[in-house]
Amino acid sequence: MEQYEKVEKIGEGTYGVVYKARDRVTNETIALKKIRLEQEDEGVPSTAIREISLLKEMQHGNIVRLQDVVHSEKRLYLVFEYLDLDLKKHMDSCPEFSQDPRLVKMFLYQILRGIAYCHSHRVLHRDLKPQNLLIDRRTNALKLADFGLARAFGIPVRTFTHEVVTLWYRAPEILLGSRHYSTPVDVWSVGCIFAEMVNQRPLFPGDSEIDELFKIFRVMGTPNEETWPGVTSLPDFKSAFPKWPAKELAAVVPNLDASGLDLLDKMLRLDPSKRITARNALQHEYFKDIGFVP
């Protein structure tokens, strides 16, 4: 750990404290994540070390690069490139952002590019949200942070500071207790983020798992065996769920053009087997006029 000098604490993530730090060897500024593990007395599980080591191989312009993994005194520190702006901060500080469809499109394209890369390496994110989409102020390049950490460490219900981990971007199959979910969970999250960029407010801001599900069903319709074969067999599906009809997406996201609505509709299919893949989303007509993307 001698190589890294902490400069200041910059936040508290899902897994532990995040510091702005300096690499004493290269003098570059980095982000240092101290991972707080549940079973701290036992040290770091070897499975977590293996998972994290694989992530060092992931290199792509839309992924925050994991530069180093330091295992010291039963603690795990992850060293990432440093970016100080995230999509949530950007949306909060620039409400006019949603009025710029080109920028929304450019950010969405980069999110999908990063995800398609990860999925092609069989890595899921599972916890995508505006807070872990980082933006380079100079270039408007967008990079996904915390990819693969969920598999290494699990997703806690609360962070180590007892903040509730957000459910707003969680896919319906996870909320319904499916154990066999896959890459479509990330595409669902991206759909929610897409709508939020356009509407300037979260699409499904639930405050509990059941509230989250019902907020989804009120817009997308309550699923049944016809619309989602197998849904009634999921562990947390209840036949007593209210049966809401689906709304028109155009009424829910009124500022989005027809091709944008078509893409959003394909990302927000309740049945994960019918959801568009990240790779196919990049080929969608919505992006035909995309031009240069950082």
Curated annotation (Swiss-Prot):
The modification Phosphothreonine is found at T14, T161. It catalyses: L-seryl-[protein] + ATP = O-phospho-L-seryl-[protein] + ADP + H(+); L-threonyl-[protein] + ATP = O-phospho-L-threonyl-[protein] + ADP + H(+); [DNA-directed RNA polymerase] + ATP = phospho-[DNA-directed RNA polymerase] + ADP + H(+). GO terms for biological process: cell division; G1/S transition of mitotic cell cycle; regulation of G2/M transition of mitotic cell cycle; regulation of meiotic cell cycle; signal transduction. Residues 4-287 form the Protein kinase domain. It holds the Pfam family Pkinase. One of its GO terms (molecular function) is cyclin binding. It is an enzyme of class 2 (transferase). Phosphorylation at Thr-14 or Tyr-15 inactivates the enzyme, while phosphorylation at Thr-161 activates it. ATP binds at I10, G11, E12, G13, T14, Y15, G16, V17, V18, K33. InterPro entries: CDK (IPR050108), Kinase-like_dom_sf (IPR011009), Prot_kinase_dom (IPR000719), Protein_kinase_ATP_BS (IPR017441), Ser/Thr_kinase_AS (IPR008271). GO terms for cellular component: cyclin-dependent protein kinase holoenzyme complex; cytoplasm; nucleus. Keywords: ATP-binding, Cell cycle, Cell division, Kinase, Mitosis, Nucleotide-binding, Phosphoprotein, Serine/threonine-protein kinase, Transferase. The modification Phosphotyrosine is found at Y15. The active site is at D127. Signal peptide: none annotated. The keyword Cell cycle applies. The keyword ATP-binding applies. Plays a key role in the control of the eukaryotic cell cycle. Belongs to the protein kinase superfamily. CMGC Ser/Thr protein kinase family. CDC2/CDKX subfamily. This is Cell division control protein 2 homolog A. It comes from Antirrhinum majus. The gene is CDC2A.
